[in-house]
């Protein structure tokens, strides 16, 4: 069924929809506009009510807008795909299985991407990303711009390419995460991580990469403020240029300057 140029509000206006195409539709004030729906395509739509896409399956959104009033807009879904969307809503993406994002901007990234699994993301800009990506796993992302704090904590099996990350306390207690060709500004980066691997990255911020297990750095460089690195970490590293200071890495660690 196709629905074009209509406005819906109230509670559950399109609840349990099936095989639905929405074009230039607004879901206004209310809750759970598309809850428990299946096989949905939304194009050039506007979502204003809270909890709009919850417990849904096989949903694609193109050129859509999620307003700040649409709190927690995308939770508990499977096979969710967004392209060319703007999200002003906080707490987007919670417990999503099989998530695809391309060319997305999120202006309030607080608590976004918690417990998301099997994700492919490219060209994502996320602001105010406090605690974003907590407990996410099996994530592949390229061209990420992120500003926030406490991000990627307890994340598992992440691969990130060509990112700019400005985030305090990132990757704490993470496991099996690899970052390529990225700029990372993070005080206390990667504490208590396991199998964190950084390849051709530029790192800034005090006391990076402490208490880390099996830390690997390949051709990385450090800014002058990245002091007191590697305390109590087990590490294999090749460093380009000078490293401001090192504090007591574990015995057996190998650090080579080029």
Predicted segments with their positions:
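Long, distal/terminal scaffolding or interaction modules
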Residues: 1-258
């Amino acid at each position: 069924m196709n629905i074009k140029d209509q406005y819906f509000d109230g509670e559950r206006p399109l609840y349990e929809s099936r095989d639905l195409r929405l074009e230039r539709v607004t879901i206004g004030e209310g809750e759970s506009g598309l809850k428990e729906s299946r096989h949905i395509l939304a194009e050039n739509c506007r979502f204003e009510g809270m909890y709009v896409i919850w417990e849904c399956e096989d949903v694609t959104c193109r050129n859509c807008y999620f307003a700040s009033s649409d709190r927690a807009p995308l939770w508990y879904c499977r096979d969710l795909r967004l392209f060319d969307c703007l999200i002003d809503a906080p707490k987007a993406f919670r417990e999503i299985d099989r998530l695809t994002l391309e060319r997305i901007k999120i202006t309030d990234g607080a608590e976004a991407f918690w417990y998301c699994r099997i994700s492919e993301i490219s060209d994502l800009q996320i602001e105010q990303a406090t605690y974003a990506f907590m407990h996410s796993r099996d994530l592949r992302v390229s061209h990420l711009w992120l500003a926030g704090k406490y991000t990627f904590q307890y994340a598992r099996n992440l691969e990130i390419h060509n990112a700019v990350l400005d985030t305090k306390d990132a990757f704490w207690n993470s496991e099996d995460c690899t970052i390529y060709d990225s700029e990372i500004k993070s005080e206390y980066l990667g504490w208590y991580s396991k199998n964190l691997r950084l390849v051709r990255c530029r790192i800034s911020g005090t006391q990076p990469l402490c208490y880390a297990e099996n830390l690997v750095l390949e051709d990385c460089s450090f800014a002058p403020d990245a002091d007191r690195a590697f305390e109590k970490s087990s590490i294999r590293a090749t460093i380009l240029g000078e490293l401001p200071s090192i504090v007591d890495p574990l015995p057996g660690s190998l650090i080579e300057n080029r």
